[in-house]
Amino acid sequence: DSYLNSMKKSIQANDGAYDLIDGYAAVIGGAYADGLMMNLHDVSNLRPTSMWWSQLAVNELTVNGKLFGIPGDLSLNLWKNIHVMFFNKTVLENNGLEKPYDTVKNGKWTYDKYLEMNVGVARDLDGNGEVSLEDSFGSIYYDDLSFDNFHNAFDYSYTVKNDDGSISLDLDEQIMVDTYEKIRSLAYENPDVYYNKGGKVEGTIDVFTQNRALFFASVLGDAEKMRDMNSDFGIIPFPKLSEAQEQYKTTSRDNRSMFCIPTDVKDADFAGLITEALCVASNRGVVPVYYDTVLKGKVARDSESAEMLDIIRSGLNFDFAAEFAIQTGRAGFILRDAIYYDKNYTTYYNESKKMFNKAFDRFVSYYMEEK
């Protein structure tokens, strides 16, 4: 709050102190609603449709022709926070399973296939008859944010765009109920899956690096924590809902950057030029080094994982409701919250829909104002 408030005060005072704002994605939307950021589509020398900006994000986050913040190659945290699945090759071999790379490439890496590979992997290693972090598992999750990514992986959006350029919530659909039931069962009922509810990555990742979990659902940046892992591991995308789905999809967590130009900027054209140039330079000189040298060269243990990274990157997606969940009554966090609090999806939605719609429509109304 102090970060956002300090920035707001400066812009409202017309200080002209900032040419470019590297906004914290989770909260920067509060400045959009206050009319403090420029429409990036109107900034000369800035080209949001260029490949170094995330095009799926530009398409999803543009409403009524307005885009107030943009993620792109200007910051590596976009890619470090992208959701992926890691698999442990030692655990894979010990359970007589095949590497899932060909399954991914053939478009057959589905949720059902993922569940199938988990079956029978869990072991009560300490023999106490209770499930704990001392045991082994098919999959391990340390927070509800990874569960939240399944709605992206299943290629479903929380919103729908309307003919008048506006956007509306679309949470009351059977696919959301079905997704909730699948993920709730995964979190609370699957004997081969451990949900370290409220846990931290530091304690949970040890289960994976110590060969006690086949799959670890997390973010790509956590691969850097596995450099000293003795066993080899692979990186694959989250599974699709079915083979009929054309593309593997994922998203990047909201503790990343969103780049904005404030309305009190002294020279918007210059700010756009520098922002574009920085993003181009990072796209050509920083991101390739991170992927080819750090990830593909030092972290990824095989060429197949390097190929998987390209597939994952191509499916980076964003959801307007999830992107601005804090500003819209947590409507875009409905899946993670229902899972975390173990509440029936339909009941939770019916209890919250009036609040969701009111907060969401209020936020969207700024996009619909004529400027």
Regions found by a protein language model. Give the residues of each.
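Short helix-initiation/N-cap motifs at beta->coil->alpha
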Residues: 1-6, 107-113, 194-209
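Extracytoplasmic/periplasmic substrate-recognition and gating elements
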Residues: 226-295
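Short, solvent-exposed loop/beta-turn-alpha elements that line the ligand-binding surface or hinge
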Residues: 41-53, 104-106, 132, 157-176, ...
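Acidic, glycine-anchored loop motifs typical of Ca2+
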Residues: 60, 124-135
